[in-house]
From Swiss-Prot:
Gene: NOP9
Primary residence: nucleus
Protein name (record): Nucleolar protein 9
GO MF entries: RNA binding
CC terms in the record's Gene Ontology section: 90S preribosome; nucleolus; preribosome, small subunit precursor
Primary role: RNA-binding nucleolar protein required for pre-rRNA processing. Involved in production of 18S rRNA and assembly of small ribosomal subunit.
Organism, as annotated: Trichophyton verrucosum (strain HKI 0517)
Length: 716
């Protein structure tokens, strides 16, 4: 008799037990089930941390995924259209502004009702950023209203968060413009309503909310979720932008640029933004009073649920620390001294008032930030914007005795740079003496940022740099040629030398060396002489090699800048370029050196004539090259060939708009300041008012009173 087919082994037993469990689920078990309250019978103290199991973590993740809305996907035809529109905007090959405006309006018409889809699309979100950067204020506000109600989800989206940042940055100047001209806008609205009549489509922009209300709506929409948005990888960037906008701080400032976006982010604004738009985001803006109150409430809500321990842990968090930097810069720089003294402020919760003097927890916290790659950036922010009283205590208690060892460290040296930029002349001089023993090791490891900062600040503070020059001379050697090669990194030109070190590391070292050489050339005295003697000791081949190097040529251009103190140096160096003008003019980096030779020979006309003759001899080669034509134009060689007399006057600085405009007009009257112009207008107005009443009034009447400012002008 055939047997029944059965599975053998553990798999069969497992399936049978699974069926039994499924059958038993329907029947009520007589055993009492444990409730959730009984799991947490333990009394929670201050140090109690609840146990989060894997099941609860999965449930939370599943809940977050379910809460995230799905706005839909674009069709294939829509994706093709928007990708072509993105390419068109990037090329920016429009005939005029009207053509560009009509194209943007057509794209907005096609995108109507699909704005959220485009913002969340991987391929089309960049189009949305470009559109926002090129849009008019009405279009920006209309798109702002389309996003309203969805910002909590959009700021956490990988692609839509970038669109939100771009939208906030573009809408920030609109708030200021609406504050400055509210009356004119009312008149414009009346005129437009009269002309448009009862057309609903034309009246739609007139019903828009003010930009201030739109921003306040974003804050209220995100309110209550600051805790997890603070450390969310995408939303944290948007929070930083929002904080700076509410505070009226510059959005493209050098100090704020690194906390707004990462280095990997594509700079779409550089392609689409205009000069006026760049100017508006680089300047501080006037913000309404509602922004100030909202900003204070937002910062208090951000830090309300965070104790001092969590705040100190947030200082080294790679995502939360930049937000903390923005909060500290706003608290210490915008909210005044009262906020700094407030014990509930973020700054005082991180560093209590008396901890630096008693050497308690605050000092340990600050010491831990020096060597942390993330925390050191927060410490740089504290050093940059902290009140003067706190900075002096911080410098005397923590920095002064160990500034040499801190300057030697790769991470802590950046904090030392910020400290050196703020200390007084006496403290700078003592800091130089403390760092001098570390100069050889800094030079050996190519960590030249601290040395460059010392030279720059010594030039500003008029500090003595003789001891620093001796230390650098002993570290680099007395041979000028070897010193120049080491600083600028021109000795590593062979293939074997280039294969020893990574390309990125060597390029960074060469950049720091070039910046150090430029700083030494700008400093008076022995430091500048060190670089000048090194250039004079270099043969022609090395000079041409330096001129053709994109990094090292900057130092050569700085050395060629004319001044009264380096006339003898230029007289000796410039003949080294005889016979090299054509070679330099045809090189991308050397062409800049060729342009610098025009200014370098402003008081050495006989050298300029010889260099110009070399350009004439190689005219055909120069005209065949784009770089050569630029050098030919900058040297005014057409004028040299046709009107030699006019070229000579321009070469001497008598008719050169680039160089001699200030010197040519030196005999004329200096430009009047705004105060002088205002005084002149006041005096002219006074003379006009006094003419009809001069017969009726006496010597002490209106005429004498009004003529007093003109008398003051003559006295001045």
């Amino acid at each position: 008799m055939p047997r029944e087919k059965k599975k053998r082994g553990r798999r069969a037993e497992k399936s049978q037990s699974k069926r039994k469990r499924e059958d038993e689920e329907g029947s009520d078990s007589p055993k009492r089930q444990r409730t959730t309250n009984e799991d947490n019978d333990v009394q929670a103290g201050d140090d109690y941390i609840p146990l989060v199991t894997h099941d609860t973590e999965k449930e939370q993740e599943q809940g977050q995924e379910d809460d995230t809305p799905f706005y839909g996907l674009l069709d294939t035809e829509e994706q093709e259209y928007f990708s072509k529109a993105s390419q068109t905007l990037e090329l920016n090959s429009f005939e005029d502004d009207d053509d560009k405006r009509l194209f943007i309006e057509s794209v907005y018409t096609e995108a109507k009702g699909k704005e959220l889809k485009i913002a969340c699309s991987q391929s089309c979100s960049r189009l949305m950023e470009k559109l926002i950067a090129m849009s008019t204020p009405d279009q920006v506000k209309a798109l702002f209203e389309k996003f309203s109600g969805h910002f909590l989800h959009l700021v956490q989206h990988r692609f839509a968060s970038h669109c939100c940042e771009c939208l906030f940055i573009r809408a920030a100047p609109i708030v200021t413009s609406e504050m400055e001209k509210p009356k004119d806008k009312k008149k414009d609205r009346k005129q437009t309503t009269e002309t448009n009549g009862e057309d609903g489509e034309q009246d739609e922009p007139m019903n828009q909310k003010p930009a201030m209300d739109l921003f306040l709506g974003v804050v209220s929409e995100l309110e209550g979720n600051w805790g997890y948005l603070l450390t969310e990888s995408f939303a944290s960037h948007t929070i930083r932008v929002l904080l700076l906008i509410l505070a009226g701080e510059p959005l493209a400032d050098h100090s704020n640029a690194r906390v707004l976006a990462s280095r990997k982010k594509e700079n779409v604004d550089s392609i689409t933004s205009t000069a006026q738009a760049e100017l508006t985001i680089r300047e501080s803006r006037q913000v309404p009073a509602e922004f100030n109150s909202t900003l204070r409430k937002m910062i208090s809500d951000l830090s309300a649920g965070l104790n001092s321990t969590y705040l100190q842990a947030l200082a080294t968090h790679p995502i939360g620390s930049p937000v903390l930097q923005v909060i500290l810069s706003i608290e210490l720089g915008c909210m005044g001294k009262e906020k700094v003294k407030d014990k509930s402020s973020v700054f005082r919760r991180l560093v209590p008032d008396d901890t630096l003097e008693t050497k308690e927890e605050g000092v340990n916290f600050l010491n831990s930030l020096f060597y942390d790659p993330v925390g050191s950036r927060l410490l740089e922010t504290i050093v940059r914007v902290a009140p003067g009283k706190f900075f002096k205590t911080f410098y005397k208690t923590i920095i002064r005795e160990r500034i040499g060892s801190l300057a030697r460290n790769e991470i802590a040296s950046y904090v030392v740079i910020k400290v050196l930029e703020r200390v007084s002349r006496e403290d700078l001089q003592s800091a130089i003496e403390s760092i001098l023993p570390e100069i050889p090791s800094l030079v050996q490891r190519s960590r030249l940022n601290v040395i460059k900062t010392i030279i720059d600040r010594s030039t500003v503070r008029s500090a003595d740099t003789t001891s620093l020059a001796k230390a650098l001379e002993s570290a680099y050697g007395e041979d000028g040629l070897v010193r120049l090669k080491t600083i600028l990194g021109v000795e590593a030109t062979d293939k074997d030398a280039e294969s020893v070190k990574p390309k990125a590391a060597t390029s960074a070292q060469h950049l720091h060396g070039s910046l150090l050489a430029q700083a030494m050339l700008q400093a008076p005295g022995r430091l500048a002489t060190m670089i000048q003697t090194s250039f004079l000791a270099a043969p022609v081949e090395i000079l041409i090699q330096i001129a053709k190097n994109s990094t090292a040529s900057r130092a050569l251009q700085e050395a060629l800048k004319p001044s009264k103190s380096n006339t003898q140096f230029r007289r000796q160096l410039l003949p080294q370029f005889y016979g090299q003008m054509c070679d330099l003019s045809l090189d991308s980096s050397g062409s800049h050196v060729a342009d610098a030779l025009w200014d370098a020979t402003s008081d050495l006309v006989f050298i300029k004539q010889r260099l110009a003759q070399e350009l004439v001899d190689n005219e055909s080669a120069l005209r065949d090259s784009f770089l050569g034509r630029a050098v030919w134009r900058n040297w005014s060689m057409d004028l040299y060939k046709r009107k030699r007399g006019e070229w000579m006057s321009r070469a001497k600085g008598l008719d050169n708009p680039r160089v001699s405009a200030p010197t040519a007009d030196s005999s004329a009257e200096p430009a009047k300041s705004k105060l002088d112009l205002a005084r002149a207008r006041y005096a002219a107005r006074a003379e006009q008012q006094e003419k009809p009443d001069s017969r009726e009034q006496g010597p002490r009447g209106k005429k004498q009173a009004l003529s007093a400012p003109s008398g003051l002008l003559k006295a001045q």
